[in-house]
Amino acid sequence: MEPNLLIAAISGFVGALILTFLIYLLKLFGQDIDIPYLIGTRFVDIQKKSQVYLDASLLHLLIGAGWGMLYVILLTAMVVTPNWPAGILWGFGHGIFVGAMIGIIADTHPYIGEDNPIKSPGILGREWGTLMPYWILGLHIIFGVCTLSIYHWWLTG
């Protein structure tokens, strides 16, 4: 079975849309998680808050589309059906990767660290709170399940 990259990208985009919605829902309930904001402040001056959020949200959704394509390409190459059970495993691996990268990328981020407006997250966001590693993993598992469920549904009807 050949991967359909357009459907994979759309599925990843929708998965990232759901992930972003859940991030801001958690933020509304007092959790200090705002991954799109971290992405935005990497490229836009922190004083331009509306521009930060606009660019960050768009970039986060495009990154999600890229991850959707990567999921489908790798699963198809492994001759595994891209469906929701595979989404659980790939989402977990994705969450581990993102959690590790947050700590590494923070070292070069212009607004993260001591004497900067954003506190350093540490590996898996541990420095942002006790629940943060669980949120990062859980949200990316949800992303994987949503992305691959949409892809599988779209192809099989």
Where are the regions that the model predicts?
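Juxtamembrane/disordered regions of integral membrane proteins
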Residues: 1-157
